[in-house]
């Protein structure tokens, strides 16, 4: 028989649908009608779906057809009629176990088999969706009173329609399809129902009659197999060992099977092995068809479940084809719709089923050998009939149905006698289409097994119960199963199955999928592989196995058997495990219910796989990854997919292909029904393993079930209604709907697709062990099959799939991976989603339970529902067609299956316990294995069900392509899916379950896991990759949702207030950090100290803004080697919840080396070091003296090596042919070489330490070492550093090294003075490294506050107290840095390029008045010093109102030039205002001042109320800020002070600055005799001008009316009040005045620019001054005051004084414009004005050099007390510090963290308290030759622009040359603006004479006040 089944051609064997055994009921016609209705006929796709009930009938036919198909001889009239093809498609061919019985009998047997294996379950699921039709049709088709495949033929026909490929006898399929297309489904369904009723289901008379007719037909075609007596319930009852048969009978609730199943469930012993499960199933089907549920109370839950399973098994012929495997797995799935069902079924039914599978493997062989023998115990079927045992069972089902029903009812106590039976039938019916499909796919494989009986029983039950009943049963199963926690069981079973299938996969003939199954537990392989191989040896068995597996996976029969076997076997873990299995199964059942709908087509394997998948879904992602059966030749799955054995290799392949797609779709659709069914059976399985415990629960649940199944039955009955409006059992409704409406089409599709595609899909599912099995069971049997039938079916099917199973497995897997991926992912994503929506739904109780037990599986169940619902459309026929498959010796098979099941239960219990801890673990494997999984596997996680369905469709289509199935089928399936989604409320709910919110829940769980897994490897990347799954979800979700729902915000590190980086180290907790650091350092225990710090974001600083420390970490002892500061990220549980922010290696470099370096560096740098001006050297107000008050000893920093240059945007040596990395003052190459050797050696020593302690940062920094070796420090390979900064007693204020390389860090080597080199010694003075944003944690690394307090007591943590410290505010600038000193040269270079004739003239003229002006300037300077001596120079003083300023200015006397701070800006390069406006002048001045004199000599003008107008610039530390004219007068010093106008931002930033930030007015030296200058406060003007170089700035100035000030100075000259709010106006006014009259009057008019205090005299002087020559050579230190003045005024006039004035070219333009616009300003000057201006200029120029000599004395200092008490009062203000030791190495991410160093009490760089060597690598240092290529490219571009600009004029060229100027200068050339301004002045103002000066009235009038915008 097996050989025949294996070898017969498609045409040879009658497909379950095609071969409708000529039943006296004229089953052929109903089959035709059913096929029309349920087949994928184009004419009535949905009617076919609606005819899912007919599919059940077709499943019977499928079973028969498969029996025929399996049999080489197509005795079945259906097969002769051409239903064999449909039967193949529907799984009928799978049932063909004997050539002689290939006709009706194989169909029946396949039906039983499919029922047993889950085809009935598939059919039932289809029926659950289309209860009305599916229930009726199965009754008609497979459950005739005679047990003959009359209805099976009809089922074959509908299976053929649904699965034309299965239809070897296309005639019957066509007839059935026609009939269905005509009315068909309803009528056929009614007939089927009648037929199913005679099989033992309490169904309408017409249903019974149909069943009887079918049985008669089957008896006629397969008298032996159909013999009802053969399938005696007693035999099955007596053979509890054949739990597969029991499960099949439970699933099928066929008469004999039901009885046997009852006995099985009641009696754990596997004594029925001789009787094929198919027989039992068949008998149960008959009985169940005729006798709804004999014993409602015996096994209330199990019985109900068994009944449901039976009903489900009746439906799916694939399960029957799967035979006992299918049946058992179907029962298992019915009892454990999800993995729980599979788990229990796996142990009980799996073992039974495995035995049956083995028996089926062998049983198929035995079927061939003893088709009758295996059935003989219960049925008197010939060997072929034994293969077609379902037929024989169909005859006994009348007998056994009652028993089975009784047993099922007893088990199910929840169901009423009839109601339970009906529900069982309905559940079976729902699964029957699936089973039929599966069996149809592998009719021969399943023929020997009782899946046929199961399908018939399912059919009978389905026929007996209304679709509503089926739905009720399915719903009940769904509810009950979830209540029983099927998800856990399912997961266990799934896991176990996954292992087993994976193990079996290698055995699978299709080695392709072995891989996936190999991952499964080897136990399954061992248990199932032999059977699988045996089954695999039979090609027909493969087909049957495939269908059986599909059915068994989906078939409730297998679930029932599994459940009964569980109960009978009394698995040690059966009952105990059952709760967990139930828990697991319930969620997974839900998922399966969802998936079964999707996976009806591939349901045999897919449902089973799905159950496993739900387990293996997490455990086994690889099978899931494999999209094709070849990719996943899961031997374990193969047994489930026996239909390949049944089908010829060619026909199997073809059928498998089509069936694969069909099964994918139907399996997808069925998957949901399976999920429902499997949920219900899962509950039953859960009860079954724990029958004792479960029965009690069942009794409780039975009440619920009775209610729920009834409801579900009603829901099934109102399948369309459910689709339209039923929200009760989303899964069930979806199942029923999909099974009903979509099932027919799915069946039609699956008839072909499931024959081959289904086989391959099953194989693929088997190969993709967790996936295919889970999906397939879910597909075929929404219920337990995935768990129970999965293993047995997988074994048999793998045995059967060696050849064809591969293909079908491939196809099924292809679809399944799609399903699996959708299912797994969707299950994962939707498990919780599905759980929530399901909980919300009528299934909520079940789902809640499932969710509580296995939230993910419920989502999976929902997904299964969805999938099954989608696949139900394609799989309905297979359920019908595969009910007659396997009738091997029930004893051996059942014993084997029982043993396997027991073993599987144990294994699953273990796996479940492992997996039970959480679905997250399951999910975690999914996450781990998604790489190997198909893309579809990844799909479902985040996307909604809509996406899921589309993905499923895509997956289905791809399998169809793989299987060669017509695209039309795929399209049809997709259409069904679409329709299902659109129409089915359940689908909608499934979508709701898949809603993002639900998805978010699992993803949140996964978020932490993903973070945990991904963050460690790629912390930063993990932002996106940690939670790849989460990201998908989070992308769609609100950013904060995960943090709300989840426990970790690791996916959103950007939310962290503190910086996020992990290249120093990160871990999930502090202990992980300790482990990490111990591994890095190599020591443990006390050697590693970890301190937790908390980021507050509140910077600790003194009242002056200087660094302070509140807590100090000190080295506790010599034992402590390493201190690690870590930040615990709040609300994070990810792998980077704890970050390393600093690593202090106390013994970094040898003490000897440290001491040597200290002495050498002190010597070299003290003598020749060139100080580097750093902004961090002072506070924000630039007035602190943290570096020291003595410029000769103050702290300083020196930079060496390569560093990033903003100018080059690369290495600063880009243009250097011979870069001097260690450049020292003067030409001292020896000293430079000496210094370089020390630093190079140090870098070489530190590099390996750095690599050891911070490998990630090190690797990042050495990435471009070979590309840019020139920019590296070090003598050996591995040079992470490019530069070194040596800080000697240098107090760095809070800052970040933003120019550092990303993902790098800085290494700080500390060299302490001799008195601070011992551990524990507390020196008199020391410097701390501070993290001002952090506070210490209240507890230590172990969470102990006592430990922290102990550290404080011991002194390792020093808590500082608030303190008041005397500080000095420096009025003058500190000594300029070496860089400033070098500014003169740079200024000269730039001056030469920018020099203009006008500037030269101006400079020459200014030089004339040098001597005279110098004297005057000196006098003014002294006066200014006196004036500035007042302590009002503080920033707030600057803010004083102009009147006060005037008063102060008038009262003040010039001060002595003060030494500028060493922070003046660098060379007058494009420094802001002064340099550019006065390109040469400012530069020269700046350089000169910066050089020495003016830097230190700069003074505030005596007039300025802020004696430190120069100090303002000093505060900013810019060389240019230094008073260009420091000594000439306060005005000259502050106004013209280059530092002032060099730093336009001085005034802008610090309007309060004591010093006029801009030297314009203040810098203009004025004779002491000049009353206006004397009274005028140039500082205010400077500040205002410079501060507001733009018009807006001037307008913003808070200046008193210029006229008032001017009046005071000038008397009442209104012309003096040239106060224009806008610099442009002022500038224009000045130019106009000067142009009109270069007299002092013009100067007076010019005065408004700087400030109201700017008198006309001053203005005149300024006009006379070389302001007309802004380009005068300032570098020459001959800072012609006129030039500066002109520059400042020009800048003001140009309106770009601040932004553009700094640009030399702009200065040139301005100068040129002024000289041209104001020729008199340059040349026309009155003698007095000229003298004044010259005197100012000369004095300033001379004064500067003098000041240089007075550096120290020039600085005006104000003592004050800096208080830090407020920092200590607020515990949230940071100030964590580390006391570095001599030779210590500190590693920190200076680019990310704000850091600082405290002030040394007595800084002395000649003998520093601390030398810190900061090694770093700057950004953009990654090109050879110091990034010369970048510079060359930049210069080439610049040259090109200049060349282009040259055509437009010099001004334009200059702008091009100075991009920054161009940016700053919104206007074009300055000349036009001046002209416009002059014109406006001339138009709006009149000239007024005051004294001897003439000024233009525009600003001379007092009315001109305020913003002065009227002249703009």
Curated annotation (Swiss-Prot):
Residue sites binding 2-oxoglutarate per the record: 1174, 1287, 1329, 1810-1812
Residues involved in substrate binding: 1300, 1816-1818
Source taxon at top rank: Eukaryota
Effect of gene knockout: Mice are viable and fertile but develop chronic myelomonocytic leukemia probably caused by dysregulation of hematopoietic stem cells. Mice lacking both Tet1 and Tet2 are fertile, with females having smaller ovaries and reduced fertility. They display decreased 5-hydroxymethylcytosine (5hmC) and abnormal methylation at various imprinted loci. Embryonic stem cells lacking both Tet1 and Tet2 remain pluripotent but lack 5hmC, leading to developmental defects in chimeric embryos.
Cross-link (Glycyl lysine isopeptide (Lys-Gly) (interchain with G-Cter in ubiquitin)): 1212
Tissue expression: Expressed in the brain, kidney, heart, lung, muscle and stomach. Expressed in germinal vesicle (GV) stage and MII-stage oocytes and in early embryos. Present in embryonic stem cells (ES cells).
Residue ranges with Low complexity bias: 690-701, 907-921
Effect recorded for residue 1212 to R: Strongly reduces ubiquitination
GO annotation, biological process: chromosomal 5-methylcytosine DNA demethylation, oxidation pathway; cytosine metabolic process; hematopoietic stem cell homeostasis; hemoglobin metabolic process; hemopoiesis; homeostasis of number of cells; kidney development; leukocyte differentiation
Biased composition (Basic and acidic residues): 1-11, 1842-1866
Effect caused by changing residue 1212 to N: Strongly reduces ubiquitination, loss of DNA-binding, loss of 5-methylcytosine demethylase activity in vivo. Does not affect nuclear localization, nor interaction with DCAF1
Pfam families: Tet_JBP (PF12851)
Substitution effect: residue 1295 to Y: Loss of enzyme activity, no effect on interaction with DCAF1
Compositional bias of kind Pro residues: 1456-1473
Catalytically driven reaction(s): a 5-methyl-2'-deoxycytidine in DNA + 2-oxoglutarate + O2 = a 5-hydroxymethyl-2'-deoxycytidine in DNA + succinate + CO2; a 5-hydroxymethyl-2'-deoxycytidine in DNA + 2-oxoglutarate + O2 = a 5-formyl-2'-deoxycytidine in DNA + succinate + CO2 + H2O; a 5-formyl-2'-deoxycytidine in DNA + 2-oxoglutarate + O2 = a 5-carboxyl-2'-deoxycytidine in DNA + succinate + CO2 + H(+)
Extent of Basic residues compositional bias: 1387-1396
UniProt key word Repressor: no
Single GO molecular function: 5-methylcytosine dioxygenase activity
PTM text: May be glycosylated. It is unclear whether interaction with OGT leads to GlcNAcylation. According to a report, it is GlcNAcylated by OGT. In contrast, another group reports no GlcNAcylation by OGT in human ortholog.
A Gene Ontology term for the protein's cellular component: chromosome
Annotated Fe cation binding sites: 1295, 1297, 1795
Chain positions recorded as Zn(2+) 2 binding sites: 1106, 1184, 1186, 1293
InterPro entries given in the database record: 2OGFeDO_JBP1/TET_oxygenase_dom (IPR024779), TET1/2/3 (IPR040175), TET_oxygenase (IPR046942)
PANTHER family per the UniProt record, alphabetical: METHYLCYTOSINE DIOXYGENASE TET (PTHR23358), METHYLCYTOSINE DIOXYGENASE TET2 (PTHR23358:SF3)
Assembly and oligomerization: Interacts with HCFC1. Interacts with OGT. Interacts with PROSER1; this interaction mediates TET2 O-GlcNAcylation and stability by promoting the interaction between OGT and TET2. Directly interacts (via C-terminus) with the DCAF1 component of the CRL4(VprBP) E3 ubiquitin-protein ligase complex.
Protein name as annotated: Methylcytosine dioxygenase TET2
Species assigned in the record: Mus musculus (Mouse)
């Amino acid at each position: 028989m097996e050989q025949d089944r294996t070898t017969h051609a498609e045409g040879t064997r009658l497909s379950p649908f095609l071969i409708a055994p000529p039943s006296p009921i004229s089953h052929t016609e109903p089959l035709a009608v059913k096929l029309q209705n349920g087949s994928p006929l184009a004419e009535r796709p949905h009617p076919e779906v609606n005819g899912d009930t007919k599919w059940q009938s077709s499943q019977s036919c499928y079973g028969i057809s498969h029996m025929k198909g399996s049999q080489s001889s197509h005795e079945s009239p259906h097969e002769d009629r051409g239903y064999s093809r449909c039967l193949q498609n529907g799984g009928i061919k799978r049932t063909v176990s004997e050539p002689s019985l290939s006709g009706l009998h194989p169909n029946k047997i396949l039906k039983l088999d499919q029922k047993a294996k889950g085809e009935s379950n598939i059919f039932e699921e289809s029926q659950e969706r289309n209860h009305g039709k599916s229930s009726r049709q199965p009754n008609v088709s497979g459950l005739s009173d005679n047990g003959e495949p009359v209805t099976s033929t009809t089922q074959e026909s509908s299976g053929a329609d649904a699965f034309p490929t299965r239809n070897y006898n296309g005639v019957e399929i066509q007839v059935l399809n026609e009939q269905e297309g005509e009315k068909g489904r309803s009528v056929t369904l009614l007939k089927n129902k009648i037929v199913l009723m005679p099989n033992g289901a309490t169904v309408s008379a017409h249903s019974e009659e149909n069943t009887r007719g079918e049985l008669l037909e089957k008896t006629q075609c397969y008298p032996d197999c159909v013999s009802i007596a053969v399938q005696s319930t007693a035999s099955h009852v007596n053979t509890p060992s054949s739990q597969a048969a029991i499960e099949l009978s439970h699933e099928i609730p066929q008469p004999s099977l039901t009885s046997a199943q009852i006995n099985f469930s009641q009696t754990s012993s596997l004594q029925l092995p001789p009787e094929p499960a198919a027989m039992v199933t068949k008998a149960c089907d008959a009985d169940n068809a005729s006798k709804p549920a004999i014993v409602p109370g015996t096994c209330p839950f199990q019985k109900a479940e068994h009944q449901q399973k039976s009903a489900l098994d009746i439906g799916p012929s694939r399960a029957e084809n799967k035979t006992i495997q299918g049946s058992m797995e179907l029962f298992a799935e019915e009892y454990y719709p999800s993995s729980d069902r599979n788990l229990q079924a796996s142990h009980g039914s799996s073992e039974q089923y495995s035995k049956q599978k083995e028996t089926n493997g062998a049983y198929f062989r035995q079927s061939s050998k003893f088709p009758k023998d295996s059935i003989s115990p219960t049925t008197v079927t010939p060997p072929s009939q034994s293969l077609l045992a379902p037929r024989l069972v169909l005859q006994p089902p009348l007998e056994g149905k009652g028993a089975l029903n009784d047993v099922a009812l007893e088990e199910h106590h929840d169901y009423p006698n009839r109601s339970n039976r009906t529900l069982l039938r309905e559940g079976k019916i729902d699964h029957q289409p699936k089973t039929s499909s599966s069996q149809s796919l592998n009719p021969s494989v399943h023929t020997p097994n009782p899946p046929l009986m199961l399908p018939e029983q399912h059919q009978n039950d389905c026929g007996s119960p209304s679709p509503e009943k089926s739905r009720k049963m399915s719903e009940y199963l769904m509810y009950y199963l979830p209540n029983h926690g099927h998800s856990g069981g399912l997961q266990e079973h799934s896991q176990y199955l996954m292992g087993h299938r994976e193990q079996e996969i290698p055995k699978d003939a299709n080695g392709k999928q072995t891989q996936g199954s190999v991952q499964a537990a080897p136990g399954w392989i061992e248990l199932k592989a032999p059977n699988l191989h045996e089954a695999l040896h039979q090609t027909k068995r493969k087909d049957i196995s495939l269908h059986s597996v599909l059915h068994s996976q989906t078939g409730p029969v297998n679930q029932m058997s599994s459940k009964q076997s569980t109960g009978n076997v009394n698995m040690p873990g059966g009952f105990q495990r059952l709760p967990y299995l139930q828990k697991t199964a319930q969620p997974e059942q839900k998922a399966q219910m969802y998936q079964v709908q999707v996976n009806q087509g591939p349901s045999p394997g897919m449902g089973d796989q799905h159950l496993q998948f739900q387990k293996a879904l997490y455990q086994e992602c690889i099978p899931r990854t494999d999209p094709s059966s070849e990719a996943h030749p899961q031997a374990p799955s193969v047994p489930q997919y026996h239909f390949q054995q049944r089908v010829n290799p060619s026909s199997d392949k073809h059928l498998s292909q089509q069936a694969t797609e069909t099964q994918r779709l139907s399996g997808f659709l069925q998957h949901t029904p399976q999920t429902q069914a499997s949920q219900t059976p899962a509950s039953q399985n859960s009860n079954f393993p724990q029958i004792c415990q479960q029965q009690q629960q069942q009794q409780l649940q039975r009440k619920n079930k009775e209610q729920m199944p009834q409801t579900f039955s009603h829901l099934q009955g109102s399948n369309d209604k459910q689709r339209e409006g039923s929200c009760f059992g989303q899964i069930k409704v979806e199942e029923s709907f999909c099974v009903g409406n979509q099932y027919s089409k799915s069946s039609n599709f699956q008839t072909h697709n499931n024959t081959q595609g289904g086989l391959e899909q099953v194989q693929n599912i088997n190969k993709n062990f967790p996936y295919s099995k889970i999906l397939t069971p879910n597909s075929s049997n929404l219920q337990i099959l995935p768990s129970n039938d999965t293993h047995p079916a997988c074994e048999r099917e793998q045995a059967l799939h060696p050849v064809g199973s591969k293909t079908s497995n491939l196809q099924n897997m292809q679809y399944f991976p799609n399903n699996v991926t959708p299912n797994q992912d969707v299950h994962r994503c939707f498990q919780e989603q599905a759980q929530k929506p399901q909980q919300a739904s009528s299934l909520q109780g079940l789902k809640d339970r499932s969710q509580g037990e296995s939230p993910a599986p419920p989502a999976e169940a929902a997904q299964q529902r969805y999938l099954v619902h989608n696949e139900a459309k394609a799989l309905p026929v297979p359920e019908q067609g595969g009910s007659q498959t396997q009738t091997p010796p029930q004893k051996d098979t059942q014993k084997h299956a029982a043993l396997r099941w027991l073993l599987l239960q144990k294994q699953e219990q273990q796996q479940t316990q492992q997996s039970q801890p959480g679905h997250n673990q399951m999910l975690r494997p999914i996450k781990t294995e998604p790489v190997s999984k198909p893309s579809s596997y990844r799909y479902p996680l985040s996307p909604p069900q809509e996406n899921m369905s589309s993905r499923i469709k895509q997956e289905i289509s791809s399998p169809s392509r793989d299987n060669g199935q017509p695209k039309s089928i795929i399209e049809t399936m997709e259409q069904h899916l679409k329709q299902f989604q659109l129409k089915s409320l359940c689908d909608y709910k499934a979508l709701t379950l898949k809603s993002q919110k639900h998805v978010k829940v699992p993803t949140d769980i996964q978020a932490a896991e993903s973070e945990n897994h991904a963050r460690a490897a790629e912390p930063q990347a993990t932002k996106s990759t940690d939670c790849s799954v989460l990201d998908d979800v989070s992308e769609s979700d609100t950013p904060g949702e995960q943090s709300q729902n989840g426990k970790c915000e690791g996916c959103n590190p950007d939310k962290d207030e503190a910086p996020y980086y992990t290249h120093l180290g990160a871990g999930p907790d502090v202990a992980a950090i300790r482990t990490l650091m111990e591994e890095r350092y190599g020591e443990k225990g006390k050697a590693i100290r970890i301190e937790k710090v908390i980021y507050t974001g509140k910077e600790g600083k003194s009242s002056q803004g200087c660094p302070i420390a509140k807590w100090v970490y000190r080295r506790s002892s010599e034992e402590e080697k390493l201190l690690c500061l870590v930040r615990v990220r709040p609300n994070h549980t990810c792998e980077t919840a704890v970050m390393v922010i600093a690593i202090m290696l106390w013994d970094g470099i040898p003490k000897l080396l440290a001491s040597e370096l200290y002495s050498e560096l002190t010597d070299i740098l003290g003598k020749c070091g060139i100080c580097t001006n750093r902004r961090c050297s002072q506070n924000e107000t630039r007035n602190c003296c943290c570096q020291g008050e003595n410029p000769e000893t103050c702290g300083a920093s020196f930079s060496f090596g390569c560093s990033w240059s903003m100018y080059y945007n690369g290495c600063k040596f880009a243009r250097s042919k011979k870069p001097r990395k260690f450049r020292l003052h003067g030409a001292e190459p020896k000293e430079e070489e000496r210094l370089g050797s020390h630093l190079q050696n140090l870098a070489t020593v530190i590099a390996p330490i750095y690599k050891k302690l911070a490998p990630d940062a090190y690797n990042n920094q050495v990435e471009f070492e070979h590309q840019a070796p020139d920019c590296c420090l070090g003598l050996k390979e591995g040079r992470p550093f490019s530069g070194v900064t040596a800080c000697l007693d240098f107090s760095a204020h809070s800052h970040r090294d933003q120019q550092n390389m990303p993902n790098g860090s800085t290494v700080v080597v500390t060299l302490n003075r001799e008195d601070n080199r011992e551990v524990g010694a507390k020196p008199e003075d020391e410097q701390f490294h501070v993290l001002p944003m952090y506070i210490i944690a209240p507890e230590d690394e172990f969470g102990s506050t006592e430990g922290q307090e102990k550290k404080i007591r011991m002194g390792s943590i020093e808590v500082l107290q608030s303190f008041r410290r005397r500080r000095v505010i420096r009025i003058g600038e500190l000594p300029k840095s070496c860089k400033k000193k070098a500014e003169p040269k740079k200024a000269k270079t730039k001056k030469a390029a920018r020099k203009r004739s006008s500037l030269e003239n101006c400079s020459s003229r200014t030089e004339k008045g040098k001597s005279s002006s110098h004297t005057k300037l000196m006098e003014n300077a002294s006066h200014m010093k006196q004036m500035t001596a007042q302590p009002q120079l503080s920033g707030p003083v600057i803010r004083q109102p102009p009147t006060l300023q005037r008063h102060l200015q008038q009262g003040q006397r010039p001060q002595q030039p003060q030494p500028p701070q060493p922070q003046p800006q660098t060379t007058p390069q494009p420094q802001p205002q002064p340099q550019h406006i006065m390109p040469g002048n400012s530069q020269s001045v700046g350089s000169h001042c910066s050089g020495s004199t003016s830097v230190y000599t700069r003074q505030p003008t005596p007039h300025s109320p802020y004696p430190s107008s120069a100090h303002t610039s000093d505060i900013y530390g810019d060389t240019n800020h230094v008073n260009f004219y420091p000594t000439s007068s306060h005005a000259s010093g502050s106004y013209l002070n280059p530092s002032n106008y060099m730093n336009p931002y001085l005034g802008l930033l610090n309007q309060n600055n004591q010093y006029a930030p801009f030297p314009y007015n203040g810098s203009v030296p004025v004779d002491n005799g000049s009353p206006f200058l004397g009274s005028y406060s140039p500082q205010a003007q400077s500040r205002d001008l410079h501060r507001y170089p733009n018009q807006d700035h001037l307008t913003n100035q808070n200046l008193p009316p210029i006229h008032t000030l001017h009046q005071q100075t000038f008397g009442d000259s209104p012309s003096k009040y040239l106060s224009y709010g806008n610099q442009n106006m002022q500038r224009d006014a000045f130019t106009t005045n000067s142009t009109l009259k270069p007299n002092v009057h013009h100067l007076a008019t010019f005065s408004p620019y700087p400030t109201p205090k700017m008198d006309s005299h001053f203005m005149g002087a300024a006009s006379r001054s070389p302001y007309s020559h802004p380009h005068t050579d300032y570098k020459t230190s001959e800072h012609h005051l006129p030039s500066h003045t002109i520059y400042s005024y020009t800048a003001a006039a140009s309106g770009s004084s601040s932004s553009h004035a700094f640009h030399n070219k702009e200065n040139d333009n301005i100068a040129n414009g002024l000289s041209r616009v104001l020729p008199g300003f340059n040349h026309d000057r009155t003698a007095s004005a000229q003298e004044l201006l010259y005197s100012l200029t000369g004095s300033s120029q001379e004064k500067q050099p003098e000041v240089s000599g007075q550096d120290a004395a020039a600085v005006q200092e104000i003592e004050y007390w800096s208080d830090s008490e407020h920092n200590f009062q607020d515990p949230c203000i940071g100030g964590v510090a580390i006391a570095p030791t001599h030779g210590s190495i500190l590693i920190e991410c200076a680019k990310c963290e704000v850091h600082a160093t405290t002030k040394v009490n007595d800084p002395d760089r000649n003998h520093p308290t601390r030398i810190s060597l900061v090694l770093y690598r700057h950004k953009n240092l990654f090109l050879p030759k110091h990034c010369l290529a970048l510079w060359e490219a930049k210069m080439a571009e610049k040259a090109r622009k200049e060349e282009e600009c040259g055509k437009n004029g010099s001004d334009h060229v200059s702008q091009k040359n100075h991009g920054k100027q161009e940016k700053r200068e919104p206007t074009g050339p300055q000349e036009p603006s001046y002209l416009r301004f002059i014109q406006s002045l001339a138009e709006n103002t009149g000239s007024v004479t005051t004294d001897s000066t003439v000024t233009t009235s525009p600003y001379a009038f007092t009315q001109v006040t305020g913003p002065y915008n009227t002249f703009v």
